[in-house]
Amino acid sequence: MNQMWRTHLQSKVEQLKEQGQYRNLHVTEKAEETWLIRNEKRMLNLASNNYLGLAGDERLKEAAIACTRKYGTGATASRLVVGNYPLYEEVERSICDWKGTERALIVNSGYTANVGAISALACRHDMIFSDKLNHASIVDGIILSGAEHKRYRHNDLDHLEKMLQIASPEKRKLIVTDTVFSMDGDIAYLRGLVQLKEKYGAIIIVDEAHASGIYGIGGAGLSHVEKDIAQKIDIHMGTFSKALGCYGAYLTGDSIYIEYLQNMMRSLIFTTALPPGTLGAIRKAIEIVKEDNERRERLIENGAYFRTHLQEAGFDIGNSSTHIVPIVVGSNENTLRFSERLQEVGIAAIAIRPPTVPVGSSRVRFAVTSQHTIADLKWAIQHIIRIGKEEGFLV
């Protein structure tokens, strides 16, 4: 190996270790509905994004198997070559029915959706206004676009408006936000954002990755909690890999947006399409979430129970109001120790550190699901509080 490169890379790895930001891949040997096995230890899973417990649902498995038998294990090409199976158009129509939009486009992941769409829509002559805590895929899409990047303070619409006020009226403007923030569990003020986009002649993209399948009528997303808001969103992005228990993502909105992205989005054009079996599972998952209000209600109730008890115990959970509940610890070292101690007693909860979150705000991120029982959560809360006290995070 080239010695110059070896020295450089080894130095960077050692630096990560010293800063408490080194990451390892740990094998999950078996994952049940709410429990998993890691390092031969059975743990309550409070770390996954399987919010509605659908990843192991037999109906999705059977749908995937049926489509795999019919079409094969791989799409064999890009959608724009010969990889566009009939399932794509069928599922895209169901997304439009679900979201009340004109046209939809399925892509391979939430990351490629955001990077591809933002970098295709905007260029160096444009301005993009992005919440400071937006997902990395949004940030990377903005960087790739070359557009002027304006980051407004988290959920601070006054700050955003000041930026919009001084922006050149000659420039195209794009506002982009997560709807549920993945590391904080709080939500965007969509009505205010829509009002600002209309007032200043912008368009808006919302990332519903952690809200699709959960909020709004039929689980259509947080933007669908109030119908008039959904109709004013220009482009909705959502994923199938979280509440829907599958893989992949979608972009949907007015036809002209989707037509443009289909022709200009490099992360669609230059990649092999999703396997047919995945599309079969997606189709079934959408059917289920549109009808299964009980799972959504149970998830929301579980989130409220978990949040309330941790907050009452004295933990810093920020402004979480959803099923994602962080305990903000601060330093990397203390956060890693907290996570390790939780895993020792059988709770899978992972330390989240920079660059995923801002420096000084490292945390253990908990994610409850609809399938957790109150007994599960009560047991976990007792251990979390005990360890928190022993480690000095609680008085």
Curated annotation (Swiss-Prot):
Pfam families: Aminotran_1_2. Its cofactor is pyridoxal 5'-phosphate. Belongs to the class-II pyridoxal-phosphate-dependent aminotransferase family. BioF subfamily. Its EC number is 2.3.1.47. It catalyses: 6-carboxyhexanoyl-[ACP] + L-alanine + H(+) = (8S)-8-amino-7-oxononanoate + holo-[ACP] + CO2. Pathway: Cofactor biosynthesis; biotin biosynthesis. This is Putative 8-amino-7-oxononanoate synthase. The modification N6-(pyridoxal phosphate)lysine is found at K242. The lineage of its organism: Bacteria, Bacillati, Bacillota, Bacilli, Bacillales. It is an enzyme of class 2 (transferase). The keyword Endoplasmic reticulum does not apply. Gene3D superfamilies: Aspartate Aminotransferase, domain 1, Type I PLP-dependent aspartate aminotransferase-like (Major domain). PANTHER family: 8-AMINO-7-OXONONANOATE SYNTHASE (PTHR13693:SF100), CLASS II AMINOTRANSFERASE/8-AMINO-7-OXONONANOATE SYNTHASE (PTHR13693). The gene is bioF. Substrate binds at R23, H135, T356. Pyridoxal 5'-phosphate binds at G110, Y111, S182, D207, E208, A209, H210, T239, F240, S241, K242. Homodimer. Keywords: Biotin biosynthesis, Pyridoxal phosphate, Transferase. One of its GO terms (molecular function) is 8-amino-7-oxononanoate synthase activity.
